[in-house]
Amino acid sequence: MATKIACFGEVLFDVFPTHRKIGGAPLNVGLRMASLGIETQIISRIGEDEIGTELLDFVTQNGVRIDSIQSDKNFATGEVVVKLDDKGSASYTINYPVAWDKIEATPEAQSVVANSDALVFGS
């Protein structure tokens, strides 16, 4: 039987001065696991917005299942503004409130966790 990984938590865009990059610690782990051929699913929440759609497309194209990414009409997909100092050290400004703070423990999400071999969460 194949290993199954569930990742729970934030999905977002890191916004740098010159570009944006999809991120969020649980999603980063999920993307890496999927690149190794491990069946991976992310449990999170995005806004019903353009960047949420972009995020879903990217995650799907990279082999992570999105069945448990919830959609929110009231809160936006997460964005974190990243500033680098002269030495390259980063500081972060998280725009609140965002959809990932509203992830619900739906029966579907609970089933994903129950049927996985491991749960990844946190930053």
Give each language-model segment a name.
Residues G9-V11, A118-S123:
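Short beta-strands and strand-loop turn motifs
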Residues M1-R65:
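Glycine-rich phosphate/adenosyl-contacting loop at the front of the ribokinase-like
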Residues E39, I43-F121:
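Conserved N-terminal subdomain of the carbohydrate kinase-like
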